[in-house]
Every structure is written in structure tokens, then in C-alpha cells.
From Swiss-Prot:
Keywords: Allergen
Keyword NAD attached: no
Domain of life: Eukaryota
Name of the protein described by the UniProt record: Allergen Act d 12
Similarity field: Belongs to the 11S seed storage protein (globulins) family.
Tissues with expression: Expressed in seeds but not in fruit pulp.
UniProt key word Protease: no
Length: 13
């Protein structure tokens, strides 16, 4: 699942 990261980068999980 793809969740928007809180750092400004794209987190791919």
C-alpha cells in the first residue's frame, strides 16, 4: 500500500 509520508517524500510500502 502507498501511504503519503510526513517528510515530503513518497513512501512505498
Amino acid at each position: 500500500n502507498r501511504q503519503p509520508s510526513k517528510y515530503g517524500l513518497e513512501e512505498t510500502i
